[in-house]
Amino acid sequence: MLILTRRVGETLMIGDQVSVTVLGVKGNQVRIGINAPKDVAVHREEIYERIKNEGDEGQATGGN
Protein backbone atom coordinates (compact mmCIF):
# COMPACT_ATOMS: atom_id res chain seq x y z
CA MET A 1 0.00 0.00 0.00
CA LEU A 2 1.29 3.41 -0.96
CA ILE A 3 0.85 5.95 1.85
CA LEU A 4 0.90 9.65 0.98
CA THR A 5 0.55 12.79 3.05
CA ARG A 6 -1.53 15.64 1.63
CA ARG A 7 -2.72 18.91 3.11
CA VAL A 8 -6.15 20.45 2.59
CA GLY A 9 -6.36 21.67 -0.99
CA GLU A 10 -3.63 19.35 -2.26
CA THR A 11 -4.31 16.75 -4.94
CA LEU A 12 -2.94 13.38 -5.92
CA MET A 13 -3.25 11.77 -9.33
CA ILE A 14 -4.16 8.17 -10.11
CA GLY A 15 -3.05 7.53 -13.65
CA ASP A 16 -3.71 10.36 -16.11
CA GLN A 17 -7.45 10.79 -15.58
CA VAL A 18 -8.31 10.43 -11.89
CA SER A 19 -7.54 13.13 -9.33
CA VAL A 20 -8.24 13.01 -5.60
CA THR A 21 -8.26 16.30 -3.67
CA VAL A 22 -8.33 16.71 0.11
CA LEU A 23 -11.18 19.15 0.74
CA GLY A 24 -11.14 19.23 4.52
CA VAL A 25 -10.28 17.50 7.77
CA LYS A 26 -12.57 17.66 10.80
CA GLY A 27 -11.81 15.40 13.74
CA ASN A 28 -11.44 11.87 12.40
CA GLN A 29 -13.24 12.60 9.11
CA VAL A 30 -11.54 13.56 5.88
CA ARG A 31 -13.54 15.05 3.00
CA ILE A 32 -12.16 14.22 -0.41
CA GLY A 33 -13.18 15.17 -3.92
CA ILE A 34 -12.67 12.76 -6.80
CA ASN A 35 -12.56 13.72 -10.47
CA ALA A 36 -12.79 10.70 -12.75
CA PRO A 37 -14.15 9.95 -16.21
CA LYS A 38 -17.78 8.80 -16.31
CA ASP A 39 -16.70 5.29 -17.30
CA VAL A 40 -14.71 4.91 -14.04
CA ALA A 41 -16.92 3.75 -11.16
CA VAL A 42 -16.22 5.45 -7.82
CA HIS A 43 -17.95 4.06 -4.71
CA ARG A 44 -17.45 4.04 -0.95
CA GLU A 45 -16.19 0.59 0.07
CA GLU A 46 -19.44 -0.43 1.81
CA ILE A 47 -21.47 0.48 -1.28
CA TYR A 48 -19.04 -1.36 -3.56
CA GLU A 49 -19.33 -4.49 -1.39
CA ARG A 50 -23.15 -4.29 -1.50
CA ILE A 51 -23.12 -3.96 -5.30
CA LYS A 52 -20.70 -6.88 -5.57
CA ASN A 53 -22.81 -9.06 -3.26
CA GLU A 54 -26.01 -8.24 -5.14
CA GLY A 55 -24.27 -9.23 -8.37
CA ASP A 56 -23.17 -12.54 -6.84
CA GLU A 57 -26.73 -13.24 -5.63
CA GLY A 58 -28.14 -12.45 -9.06
CA GLN A 59 -25.77 -14.93 -10.68
CA ALA A 60 -26.64 -17.62 -8.13
CA THR A 61 -30.39 -17.21 -8.73
CA GLY A 62 -30.15 -16.84 -12.47
CA GLY A 63 -30.56 -13.08 -12.41
CA ASN A 64 -34.22 -13.04 -11.34
Swiss-Prot record:
GO annotation, biological process: mRNA catabolic process; negative regulation of translational initiation; positive regulation of translational initiation; regulation of carbohydrate metabolic process
Subcellular location: Cytoplasm
InterPro entries in the cross-refs: CsrA (IPR003751), CsrA_sf (IPR036107)
Origin superkingdom: Bacteria
Pfam families hit by this protein: CsrA
Alphabetically ordered keywords of this record: Activator, Cytoplasm, Repressor, RNA-binding, Translation regulation
A GO term, aspect molecular function: mRNA 5'-UTR binding
UniProt keyword annotation of Repressor present: yes
Entries under SUPFAM superfamilies matching the protein: CsrA-like
Keyword rRNA processing attributed: no
Record GO cellular component, one term: cytosol
Residue spans crossing the bilayer: none
Free-text function comment from the UniProt entry: A key translational regulator that binds mRNA to regulate translation initiation and/or mRNA stability. Mediates global changes in gene expression, shifting from rapid growth to stress survival by linking envelope stress, the stringent response and the catabolite repression systems. Usually binds in the 5'-UTR; binding at or near the Shine-Dalgarno sequence prevents ribosome-binding, repressing translation, binding elsewhere in the 5'-UTR can activate translation and/or stabilize the mRNA. Its function is antagonized by small RNA(s).
Assembly and binders: Homodimer; the beta-strands of each monomer intercalate to form a hydrophobic core, while the alpha-helices form wings that extend away from the core.
Family the UniProt entry places it in: Belongs to the CsrA/RsmA family.
Protein name: Translational regulator CsrA
